[in-house]
């Protein structure tokens, strides 16, 4: 038997792969095993299974999706533990790219074989490999795997469940249904049951399971929380039990309301669920912190004998020790995701009931709640990934979460339109920007932040050719990112045509998120937005889900909406003059731009109108005392708000002036960094009480150079002269700008050490808005730990990655139709893995794996992807 097949069987014996994984199929090829291991998740699981506690689960990215960064981090984590904990030498291991790019899969097999021969593995009683002579020619077996890797995605689906979720359901059934199963079975076995009988049966199940659930919560509080307060710090208590006390209070009231409703026939039960929808939102916090709770609990059990003994003592008091604390903490998440299923069953037996319509509304409310909770969990995981990106990029002075959700990352070659040199770069694509970096070992040096709002993407068909050199393929598949106002653009080159297609698709999706087609429907001006409080969509009334950039907000009237609902939102109540042109409103006076304006600073709560020096605008609205005016570009007809100080009246003939106005003619008083006339000593006194990175631009009227930058850095205030010469402005000859504004915007993102080696800081905090910036930062701090699905580890600590016999999540399989459904609502995909729906679309369902997380996989209109299961109605199911 080939060595790679023996490796696959050994991984099955270690409970890393399921028994019927494709690697044991007669048709299997070595790439099937390579594909299963490429993201590093299963290798990390292997170490955990061999030696629980040897690997810190917080270091594993269980769903790396399309991220090369996260896959390589997993592989490096595996290699480090192999070296540090299992004693393997570096020469016995492999380079991360040997696996990720499948450059040398033979080395990977060899390293896994050495693990199988380790005493830790031997003590498990698992037969090592190779256990027999192999006759394969390694070079032949592993040849061309790197090309296959270029052509195939890692086969992980972000919405797939993990196998232990079934185990979680088993625990839930044991704990919650243990008392009602037999009565229910006897009830259902009666002959001639009417619909009312079945309805009463459903009511009984809702009532009794809720009562049992509430008793379970009380058991946790009485038998675990109270005793453990004596041995745990408040911080550890909060980490393990999260907001369980709040859940208990809510369910005390919820159970009483259910009891009252069922006692009078259940006709008001729908209203009970509708009334409690908002209060049940606290499950978002509970579910999203479950991973951290489980990890904290496991670490405390492993490190503190007094705590372990106390927990064992507490366990014996709860149902005779049948369930561990780890089991019980799972139950709340399972329970809240069951409510819509219970109501769906009740609705199916309430066809003739007068409260049927309200039951439908209650069902939709609980489906919406389940989706909200799942999206909060998903966003917590996303924020954790963003945090890892953040910590790995040097010179990055902005919070990556401000740029939306990550789409894809990886290595491309980049060439700017100005600089024609093709350079190796690592790209992180987000909804709003693409971060261009240079790789430095395991970290990255920031080179450029490209804002997608000001760019468009075009194909480069001239470079679509497969050119090979003696040492491999050239990166010859290209596309462009072109600046909308004619500034510097970029050309990107991919290794394969398939890689180019994926990158272009992700760019298109990101751009559609930040600039939706219907953003200005019905005179609104919608922008992607993070809502501080739970908000309902103005159109469909359902939650805007998640924890950041949950949807879109109109900058005029402030209403929120899903992406798919933008076109059906009622007309904006604050219609601007630009929207009334059709009704005969004439254009205002023409103005000419005295400087470039790229949206920084941004008008508070208003859409931005960007322009360049010399552009002509029509003034639509402008109070002489206001720092912000509304206008419209004559050439493009785009409208929005801009600093009133950046324009001046156009000459009578309507033509803009030829030359760029000098900085002395521009009024910068509207900007939070401009201090006006200020002496050096006065500046020192002003800035010394501020945080490092706080800066201002001041005028030096008595000096040859009019402006100076003053910035606090490492407890000192530094001063930099701004030179104006030959119609350019700069602080170093190497980097020149059109205006002071452009110079400031550049050094807000790029370190001053480019010009002054000892000054490694950007222009962080404008001195006028320092307090406001600090307030915003504190209200938007990223989560310290985001949630992957905690059920990767079952309560017994068994395998957390096998997907089950039908369809492992890492495998590539031919879709099989298992049902059809009709879309009840519109749904706009935010990601290339998602499937957009229009109301009435017929969807062929390929997989319900992921249903507990709210997502199914299917096909409609020629596209395959994941969609919210609550947005469709299965045909044949009432």
From Swiss-Prot:
Alphabetical list of Gene3D superfamilies matching this protein: 3.30.60.20, Calponin-like domain (1.10.418.10), Dbl homology (DH) domain (1.20.900.10), Pleckstrin-homology domain (PH domain)/Phosphotyrosine-binding domain (PTB) (2.30.29.30), SH2 domain (3.30.505.10), SH3 Domains (2.30.30.40)
GO cellular component: cytoplasm; cytosol; plasma membrane
Domain DH: 198-376
Keywords, sorted A to Z: Angiogenesis, Guanine-nucleotide releasing factor, Metal-binding, Phosphoprotein, Repeat, SH2 domain, SH3 domain, Zinc, Zinc-finger
Residue ranges of every copy of the SH3 domain listed in the record: 586-652, 816-877
Known tissue expression: Widely expressed.
Residue span, SH2 domain: 673-767
Name the UniProt record assigns to this protein: Guanine nucleotide exchange factor VAV2
Organism the protein comes from: Homo sapiens
Organism lineage: Eukaryota, Metazoa, Chordata, Craniata, Vertebrata
Gene: VAV2
């Amino acid at each position: 038997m080939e060595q790679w097949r023996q490796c696959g069987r050994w991984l099955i014996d270690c409970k890393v792969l399921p028994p019927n994984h494709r690697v044991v199929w007669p048709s299997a090829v070595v790439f099937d095993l390579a594909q299963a291991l490429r993201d590093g998740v299963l290798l990390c699981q292997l170490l955990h299974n061999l030696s629980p506690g040897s690997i810190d689960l917080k270091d594993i990215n269980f769903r790396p999706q399309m991220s090369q960064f996260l896959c390589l981090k997993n592989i490096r984590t595996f290699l480090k533990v192999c070296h540090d904990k299992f004693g393997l030498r570096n020469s016995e291991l492999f380079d991360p790219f040997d696996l990720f790019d499948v450059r040398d899969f033979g080395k990977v097999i060899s390293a896994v074989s050495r693990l199988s021969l380790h005493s830790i593995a031997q003590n498990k009683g698992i037969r090592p490999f190779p256990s027999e002579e192999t006759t394969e020619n390694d070079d032949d077996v592993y040849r061309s795997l790197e090309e296959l890797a270029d052509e195939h995605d890692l086969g992980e689906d972000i919405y797939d469940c993990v196998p232990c979720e079934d185990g979680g359901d088993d625990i839930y059934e044991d704990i919650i249904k243990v008392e009602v199963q037999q009565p229910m079975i006897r009830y259902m076995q009666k002959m001639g049951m009417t619909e009312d009988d079945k309805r009463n049966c459903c009511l009984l199940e809702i009532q009794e399971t809720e009562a049992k659930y509430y008793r379970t919560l009380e058991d946790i509080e009485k038998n675990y929380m109270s005793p453990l307060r004596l041995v745990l710090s408040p911080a550890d208590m909060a980490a393990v039990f999260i907001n369980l006390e709040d859940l208990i209070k809510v369910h005390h009231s919820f159970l009483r309301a259910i009891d009252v409703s069922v006692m009078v026939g259940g006709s008001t039960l729908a209203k009970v669920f509708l009334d409690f929808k908002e209060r049940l939102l606290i499950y978002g916090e509970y579910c999203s912190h479950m991973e951290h709770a489980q990890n904290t609990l496991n670490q405390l059990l492993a490190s503190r004998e007094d705590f372990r003994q106390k927990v064992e003592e507490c366990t014996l008091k709860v149902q005779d020790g049948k369930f561990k604390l780890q089991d019980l903490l799972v139950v709340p998440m399972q329970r809240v995701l069951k409510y819509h299923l219970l109501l769906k069953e009740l609705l199916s037996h309430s066809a003739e009931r007068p409260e049927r319509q309200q039951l439908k509304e209650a069902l939709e409310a609980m489906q919406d709640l389940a989706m909200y909770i799942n999206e909060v969990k998903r966003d917590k995981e996303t924020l954790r990934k963003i945090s890892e990106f953040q910590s790995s990029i040097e010179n990055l002075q902005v919070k990556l979460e401000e740029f939306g959700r990550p789409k894809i990352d990886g290595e491309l070659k980049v060439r700017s339109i100005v600089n024609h040199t093709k350079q190796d770069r690592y790209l992180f694509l987000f909804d709003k920007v693409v971060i261009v970096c240079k790789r430095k070992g395991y970290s990255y040096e920031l080179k450029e932040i490209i804002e997608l709002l000001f760019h468009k993407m075009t194909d480069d068909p001239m470079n679509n050719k497969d050119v090979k050199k003696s040492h491999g393929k050239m990166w010859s598949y290209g596309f462009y990112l072109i600046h909308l106002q004619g500034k510097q653009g970029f050309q990107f080159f991919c290794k394969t045509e398939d890689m180019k297609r994926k990158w272009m698709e992700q760019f298109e999706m990101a751009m559609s998120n930040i600039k939706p087609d219907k953003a200005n429907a019905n005179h609104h001006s919608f922008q992607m937005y993070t809502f501080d409080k739970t908000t309902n969509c103005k159109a469909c009334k359902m939650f805007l889900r998640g924890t950041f950039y949950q949807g879109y907000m109109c900058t005029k009237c402030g209403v929120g909406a899903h992406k798919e609902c933008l076109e059906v939102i009622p007309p904006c109540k604050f219609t601007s003059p630009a929207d009334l042109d059709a009704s005969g409103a004439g254009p205002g006076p023409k103005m000419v731009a005295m400087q470039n304006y790229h949206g920084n600073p941004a008008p508070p709560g208003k859409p931005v109108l960007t322009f360049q020096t010399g552009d002509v605008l029509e003034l639509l609205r402008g109070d002489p005392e206001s720092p912000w005016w509304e206008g419209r570009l004559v050439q493009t007809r785009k409208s929005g708000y801009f600093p009133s100080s950046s324009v001046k009246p156009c000459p009578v003939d309507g033509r803009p002036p030829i030359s760029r106005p000098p900085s002395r003619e521009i009024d910068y008083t509207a900007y939070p960094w401009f201090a006006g006339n200020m002496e050096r000593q006065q500046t020192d006194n002003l800035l010394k009480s501020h945080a490092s990175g706080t800066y201002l631009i001041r005028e030096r009227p008595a000096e040859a150079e009019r402006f100076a930058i003053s910035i606090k850095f490492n407890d000192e205030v530094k001063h930099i002269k701004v030179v104006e010469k030959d119609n350019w402005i700069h602080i170093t000859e190497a980097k020149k700008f059109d205006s002071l504004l452009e110079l400031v915007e550049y050094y807000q993102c790029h370190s001053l050490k480019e010009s002054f080696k000892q000054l490694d800081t950007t222009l962080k905090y404008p001195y006028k808005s320092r307090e406001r910036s600090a307030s915003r930062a504190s209200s938007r701090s990223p989560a310290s730990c985001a949630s992957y699905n905690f059920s990767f580890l079952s309560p017994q600590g068994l395998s957390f990655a096998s997907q089950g016999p039908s369809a492992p999540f890492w495998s590539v399989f031919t879709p099989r139709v298992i049902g059809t459904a009709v879309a009840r609502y519109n749904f706009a995909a935010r990601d290339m893995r998602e499937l957009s729906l229009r109301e009435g679309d017929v969807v062929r369902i390929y997989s319900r794996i992921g249903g507990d997380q709210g997502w199914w996989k299917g096909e409609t209109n020629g596209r395959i992807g994941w969609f919210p299961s609550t947005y469709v109605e299965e045909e044949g199911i009432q």
